[in-house]
Amino acid sequence: MFDDLKEYLREWFKKVITSRLFVLAVVFCLMSSALVMRLFNLQIIKGEEYQDAYTAMTEKVIKTASTRGNIYDRNGNVLAYNELAYDVTIQDTGAYKTDAQWNTMLYDLVSILNKHGESAQTSLELTLDHDGNVVYTSETQSGRKRFLCDYYGLKNVDEMDDSDGKYPSDISAPDLLERMKKEYHLTLGDDKNRDGRPLDKDGNPIDVSDEVALQIVGIRYTMRFTAFQKYESTTIATDISDETVADILEHAADLVGVNIQESTIRVYNESIYFAPIIGYTGKVTSERLEELKTVNDDYELNDVVGRTGIESSMELELKGKKGSQTAYVDNVGRILSVTGEVAPVAGNDIWLTLDLNLQKGIYHILEKQLAGVLLKTIVNQDEKDIAYIDSSSIKIPIKKAYFQLINNNVLSIDNFASEEASDVEQQIYQKYESSRVRIEQELRGELQSENATPMNALSEEMQAYMQYIYSYLSSSNKAIVQRDAIDTSSDMYQAWKNGTISLREYLYYGIANNWIDTTKLDIQSRYSNADDVFTALLDDCFRDLEQDPAFEKLIYQYLINNNVVTGRELCMALYSQNVLAYDENEVNLLRVSGEEYAYQFLMNKIRNIEITPAQLALDPCTASCVVTSAKTGEVLALVSYPSYDNNRISDSTYFAQLNADQSLPLRNNATQTLKAPGSTFKPITAIAGLEEGAITLSDMINCTGIYEEVSNPIRCWKYPGFHGPLNVVGGIENSCNYFFSEVAHRLSTETDGSYKPEKGLETLKKYATMFGLDRTSGIEISEATPSISDTDPERSSMGQGTHQFASVQLARYVTALANRGTVYDLSLIDKETDSQGNLVKDYSPAVASTLDFQTSTWDAVQQGMRQVVTNSSTKRVFDGLDVHVAGKTGTAQESQKRGNHAFFISFAPYENPEISVTVSIPNGYSSSNAAMVAKHVYRYFYGYASLDDILNSGALDASNERINGD
């Protein structure tokens, strides 16, 4: 039996060996053995060695930020400094693999920030405006293209607008946001398997609002710039509150890669007085980064830099020098150890020539003067009952002031509809809501009627609504009406412009002529007719208008005009929304009183500066004043009203409010607002006439009231009266239009008696250029470029024509008048010191040129300017002022429907000028208002009034009567 078993095994073994599978089995066993041995060697014998080699692979140099230099006024008062703060940073640790994971984490992070009134700050140049529309934040067209170029991942802007249409340079802001939402799968696209929407705790997808989406895509976009440097964290929120810090740390397990980091933030003292000058800091834009890297390669996309003002122009001096850390990082960018460190060098300090208290006092003088003008101008009448005389006597109906409380967002219409709304707010909203439904029904009925009423036959209110609908459909955001495709020479277009056809008829014409973009309408059928398109257009339009704040405001305008919403209700709402500090007595009086009391109430609030000219944004609501040292050219004050708080500029909600504010607080009115100078230009004409020999000191020009030596006769302001014979001093004192027209005419006359206007224009330009009016003033912040008139020498001689100058440019000119010929390149900067106080650079104003005119010329011009103050109608403004002032008033009309612009240039003391004061009030009605500001500036500067006197006073007296000769 044993032998049988043995024989059986022998036969079996023989079969196995001779089998073709035997060789394969042997090979498999050998390979398995080799693999096991290799794994044993890798994991057991050399595992630690390989792990070390894997994790400690790269040495990197990580830059550390320097401390930004401080900014001081001329007396050492700190205006800008740094303060310890906490930032939120984010780093890609590799924990999140899918879009859904990333978006969920970022949604949670953004929700925490928003809950505490904060938001993500990113390099994305998109935001929501005050009405909730997505808009670009790029400051220039080239900046927007540079941003888009970076987003597309292109090297230069020339690569955009490719034939495939992948990289359009004209993509709208809303379309760009939609594109980015699809890119990061924040919205459900065509690929249902790539749903990257954030998930709630139950795993359900969340549809995010545009506000949240902008922050999420902004973070992801910004992180792209450190995608290959994962050891670099990205700062996405700065100066967060302690509550936000605690909330983020509490949810740290769900926010992998999110950290709290100590940093510094920029803090501005007395911000409202200096914001237009100092500016603000923020994350560097792509365009600015490109510019900075040409002079300092240390700049990176996450850097905070000066965005405007002195912060921007002195960026390189304030920034300092970055430090560095040398560190080992692993393959996913985690820092393993720091092996070396170079400390950063603090930036230098900048000292301004400006005086804090002078700046502050003038700001409030301007505000109170504007309030005084409004008190003279606002009347308790309806617009239809106000008689128009001329642009110096325009009145503002009180209902327009009431509407501005809504129109300029002093009152929030969203609050009217909120659950927390007061009784009066609910009443206002109920009136609005019932009216809105009625108005929509009337509009639909009119637009759907085959016998629609022509525009000019509609009521004023219905015309306004129809015009708004058309403007909305043709706006850049909506662009259903393609304006570029409209044939403006067609009869239908002309009929529309003339109001002889209805909006319905015009839109049907647009459908037939293919300038209605049907791709943007929800049309189900591929073979739709004109009626289908028009119905879809109306449905789309009215659906949008229900959520459109601007249309809502238009309805409120007519509710106020028609006495449906009353001034009394709106004044009470000022207390409900905490615009005014609660006063129970006033609220009760408003509740039981009528509209006359509401009018007096609002006027008192304007008088007491509880409601400011900037809030109402009525004419006038802006002004500027520049004070210079006549002896040194230093700018002692450069004030723009209104202003803003640059400490809050990183708050996107606040920034949107500033951009929506109709008083334009972000504009520096002293440097950016260009206006014709009016009669303030006449001293230049006088100098040109004397120095060129067109007139002499003894020449008498006989004013007859109307100058008829030109084809378009020029009336003197005294017409039908006349001045009679005047010399140059009298011409300036009386600001005689006839006199200066004759001077310009003589400057335009050749020796042979022929009249050549270009000769006169060239001569006026020559002397204006001597005073620096052909170029910017030299100050270290952004400034609009001036222009000297190139048409009509006679009118140009009086400051009309095409002259355009900013206040700071007129200030340089009058400074040279005051010091008799030293033209300075003005400067806002006194000096630069290092962090230890050592002088680095002196910025004393440079002398641009010295004007070598005859002493008698200076005497005559200065005497004429002195007599403007002592003998002309301006005398009543300066009565009682112990300082001897010389000056020249000026007004300029830009529109017959708005008040004249008001100017006053001056210097004092007349006998030995120390300072010059230049005042500009756009739409300020009369130059007496500008002169009144100057008077109060001199009183304050020379100690006849204190800062407390200014701060504790109410609105200043104003006069809308025109000064003779302006």
Roles of regions detected by a PLM:
Residues 622, 713-723, 755-794:
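Mid-domain, small-residue-enriched loop/turn segments at the edges of structured enzyme/sensor domains
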Residues 57-60, 89-98, 230-238, 263, ...:
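Second-shell loop/turn segments in exported
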